[in-house]
Amino acid sequence: MPQTDTAELVVLLDDDGRTIGSAPKAQVHHASTPLHLAFSCYLFDDAGRVLLTRRAVHKRTFPGIWTNTCCGHPAPGEALQDAVTRRVREELGVGITDLRCVLPDFRYRAVAADGVVENEVCPVFCGRAVGQVHPDRDEVADHVWVPWQHMRAAAEFGWAISPWAAEQVPLLDAAGIGHRD
């Protein structure tokens, strides 16, 4: 069962990426969001397509926007790979194989139209989805499998996907991820 915003803690970081504490997720996403630990995940199918998701419209940060497969926060003391596996299962109902961290040092800051700020050290993972997608509608409004070149095109426009995905896609391209197209 997914944690609620009131129960979920995020790991706070200093500017060097060291853990300095934790805080309730519901209290850290605002105009002065402190630096905290997160992750992004891109899942591919056997045809090499990537799973895009549309964030639920009631989410606190970047509601209703199309983005990479899954994002989330590890709990204090939770290994990042375990957090990725947990959140993908909770949000999308699928398992993962071949999970690997491909951009371990990714960091970004993005300001939403409503002034809410994301400020994260956000390692990026890629893997293969196992099973049929059954999204939790409290987290995911929609989903679609697309060829990588469609993800690349969305990133080039910037406004078509989340700001973090728009930054991550060229880095993933440079790392050779998604080049089956």
UniProtKB/Swiss-Prot annotation:
Subcellular location(s) per record: Cytoplasm
Domain Nudix hydrolase: 34-167
Highest taxon of the lineage: Bacteria
Binding-site residues for Mn(2+), renumbered to this chain: 29, 36, 73, 118, 120
PROSITE patterns named among the record's database cross-references: NUDIX
Record's catalysed reaction(s): isopentenyl diphosphate = dimethylallyl diphosphate
GO process terms (BP): dimethylallyl diphosphate biosynthetic process; isoprenoid biosynthetic process
Entry keyword set: Cytoplasm, Isomerase, Isoprene biosynthesis, Magnesium, Manganese, Metal-binding
Gene Ontology molecular function terms on file: isopentenyl-diphosphate delta-isomerase activity; metal ion binding
Pfam families for the chain: NUDIX
Active site: 71, 120
Cofactor note: Binds 1 Mg(2+) ion per subunit. The magnesium ion binds only when substrate is bound.
Recorded metabolic or biological pathway in which this protein acts: Isoprenoid biosynthesis; dimethylallyl diphosphate biosynthesis; dimethylallyl diphosphate from isopentenyl diphosphate: step 1/1
Chief location: cytoplasm
A GO cellular component annotation in the UniProt record: cytoplasm
EC number: 5.3.3.2
Family from the record: Belongs to the IPP isomerase type 1 family.
Function: Catalyzes the 1,3-allylic rearrangement of the homoallylic substrate isopentenyl (IPP) to its highly electrophilic allylic isomer, dimethylallyl diphosphate (DMAPP).
The protein's name: Isopentenyl-diphosphate Delta-isomerase
Organism the protein comes from: Mycolicibacterium vanbaalenii (strain DSM 7251 / JCM 13017 / BCRC 16820 / KCTC 9966 / NRRL B-24157 / PYR-1) (Mycobacterium vanbaalenii)
Highest classification ranks of the organism: Bacteria, Bacillati, Actinomycetota, Actinomycetes, Mycobacteriales
